[in-house]
């Protein structure tokens, strides 16, 4: 892992020097071909693909090396699924409350996975920013690895619930909807992590973004009872749309196009959360 970090820092220094015109080297002959080491890595347009690859590899190694914490994160899913089974395992068919609990559980899991992942390495991030670290590549590396974690968690949760509960939703669609929910929570967690300066602040913010998902939902009152600003907040809650999708799939006559369309806002929220986190990270300096 240290060799990857040293290599990345070396390339960042080279890029920074190249941009400032401080190379100080002799110009190459017109017919000579620059070596691979002298070529600037392809940025790939939106993000620096070289940095994204190195950062992803480094972050994945860190996640795997911290096997105790990773194991605890992965254990959340089967434990939450077991709780759901203990309540709905003997019920004839799934209820709207079950669907809401499933969505909220995966949103919580995704948010908790990510809420400390930037702030805990704030010093490293700020140091590498001095050497031209690409913020887009950095965020991409986080969501790439955390999405793999979410896939495992959602897979465990989905299989356990579908095995012992009559969810009335095809297992493939159930997994995709819950994965979109978990990734949306992950992106919100990364936004929180980019905006705070201490890990304990990040953890404290998680309930403050989860509880509104409960308050402004059909879990508390009927949708037609929300009025004024509460109605707008009800419509804006990220967890609402995957819940609506599960409700549609759970009906006897499912309108698949409608059910799938309800998942799209979760993906839009994921992009929105990252889009807000990006300038926040770009503005941070020592």
PLM-predicted stretches and their roles:
Residues 61-286:
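Membrane-spanning alpha-helical segments of multipass transporters and channels
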Residues 28-39, 64-74:
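Alpha-helical transmembrane segments of integral membrane proteins, especially early/N-terminal helices
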């Amino acid at each position: 892992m240290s060799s990857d970090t040293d290599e990345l820092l070396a390339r960042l220094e080279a890029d920074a020097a190249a941009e400032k015109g401080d190379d100080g080297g002799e110009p190459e002959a017109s017919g000579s071909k620059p070596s691979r080491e002298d070529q600037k890595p392809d940025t790939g347009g939106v993000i620096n693909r070289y940095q994204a690859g190195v950062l992803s590899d480094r972050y994945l190694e860190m996640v795997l090396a911290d096997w105790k914490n990773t194991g605890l994160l992965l254990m959340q899913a089967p434990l939450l699924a077991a709780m759901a089974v203990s309540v709905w395992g003997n019920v004839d068919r799934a209820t709207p409350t079950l669907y809401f609990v499933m969505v909220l559980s995966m949103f919580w899991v995704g948010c908790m996975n990510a809420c400390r992942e930037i702030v805990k390495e704030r010093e490293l991030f700020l140091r590498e920013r001095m050497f031209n670290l690409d913020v887009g590549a950095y965020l991409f590396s986080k969501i790439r690895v955390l999405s793999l974690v979410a896939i495992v968690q959602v897979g465990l949760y989905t299989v356990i619930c579908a095995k012992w509960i009559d969810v009335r939703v095809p297992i493939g669609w159930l997994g995709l909807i819950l994965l979109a929910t978990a990734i949306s929570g992950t992106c919100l967690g990364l936004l929180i992590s980019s905006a705070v300066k201490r890990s304990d602040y990040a953890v404290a913010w998680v309930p403050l973004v989860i509880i509104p998902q409960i308050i402004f939902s059909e879990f508390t009152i009927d949708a037609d009872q929300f009025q004024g600003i509460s109605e707008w907040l009800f419509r804006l809650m990220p967890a609402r749309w995957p819940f609506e999708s599960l409700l549609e799939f759970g009906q006897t006559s499912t309108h698949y196009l409608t059910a799938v369309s309800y998942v799209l806002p979760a993906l839009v929220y994921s992009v929105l959360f990252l889009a807000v986190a990006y300038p926040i990270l770009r503005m941070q300096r020592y």
